[in-house]
């Protein structure tokens, strides 16, 4: 692939309106995920689990396509897409995760994935450069996700697809507590959207929703799968145990089986065909 055909110089975050805050947020995200790198590697890693529920919304794929994985982390989704398309580009703020992804791709003998450091708020690509743009589990890290979704739409060709997957807030009333505990766990967390907010965002900036998961899609995790030194794991566990004992609700829906505490989150996957 001729890389110059898709790359385009973009202003660094700090030089854009409101960019100081954006750059500071990016630095916080980078620091947080450097401490969470273990969640992306190894057979039990929470972000290394099966992505089939996302991939089914990406089909049908074409062997001629060029795809972009936004906030790609350690490139798990990019790795799944790669055999079905001509080229995948993965972009992420955190070099430590990109290195993990590059090592795993090399070990798997996958040569059509290009990983690069970059900001989802200012994607360094030309308009309409990609046939498919996918973003998994990242919107809740963006203070104003409309910026990133608009960028995804910009770099997707007319008629191409944008597919977004993320966890959702449990309710409008429960969002404040839910986001607050997420920030205790991961300081880079910004705000979770409601289902209708996510669909409105995509419809406004990309086009009509063509596929979406039914309300009620959830995933359940044991707490040890995602608590790291990036946040305050002891404080997080205290809040979950307090809820189990009848205390304030966190929105995490904790459950206890023996010594194991699990949490359950709502999530959504939405696909749209770029109209503008």
Predicted regions, residues:
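A short acidic, Gly/Pro-enriched loop at the edge of an enzyme's catalytic core
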Residues: 121-132
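Conserved class I S-adenosyl-L-methionine
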Residues: 2-62, 76-80, 97-100, 163-186, 223-227
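A short SAM/SAH-binding and catalytic strip from SAM-dependent methyltransferases
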Residues: 132-143
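Conserved Class I S-adenosyl-L-methionine
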Residues: 74, 208-276
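Short alpha-helix
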Residues: 191-206
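Class I SAM-dependent methyltransferase SAM/SAH-binding core
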Residues: 68, 74-122
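A short glycine-rich, Lys/Arg-flanked "PGG" loop and its adjoining helix->strand segment in the class I
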Residues: 146-158
């Amino acid at each position: 692939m001729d890389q110059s055909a898709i790359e385009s110089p973009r202003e660094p975050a700090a030089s854009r309106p409101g960019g100081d805050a954006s750059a500071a947020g990016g630095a916080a995200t980078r620091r947080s995920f450097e401490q969470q790198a273990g969640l992306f590697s190894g057979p039990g890693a929470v972000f290394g689990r099966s992505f089939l529920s996302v991939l089914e919304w990406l089909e049908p794929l074409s062997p001629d396509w060029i795809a972009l994985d936004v906030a790609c982390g350690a490139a798990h989704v990019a790795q799944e897409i790669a055999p079905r398309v001509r080229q995948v580009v993965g972009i992420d703020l955190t070099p430590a995760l990109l290195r993990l992804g590059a090592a795993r791709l090399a070990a798997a003998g996958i040569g059509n994935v290009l990983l690069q450091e970059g900001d989802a708020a200012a994607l360094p690509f030309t308009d309409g450069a990609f046939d498919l743009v996918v973003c998994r589990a990242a919107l809740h890290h963006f203070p104003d996700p409309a910026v990133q979704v608009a960028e995804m739409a910009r770099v997707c060709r007319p008629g191409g697809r944008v597919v977004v997957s993320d966890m959702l807030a449990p309710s409008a009333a429960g969002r404040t507590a839910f986001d607050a505990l997420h920030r205790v766990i991961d300081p880079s967390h910004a705000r979770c959207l409601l289902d209708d907010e996510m669909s409105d965002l995509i419809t406004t900036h990309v086009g009509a929703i063509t596929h979406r998961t039914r309300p009620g899609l959830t995933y359940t995790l044991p707490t040890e799968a995602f608590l790291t030194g990036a946040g305050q794991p002891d404080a997080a566990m205290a809040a979950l145990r307090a809820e189990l004992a009848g205390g304030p609700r966190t929105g995490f829906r904790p459950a206890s089986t023996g010594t194991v505490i699990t949490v359950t989150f709502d999530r959504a996957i939405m696909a749209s065909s770029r109209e503008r």
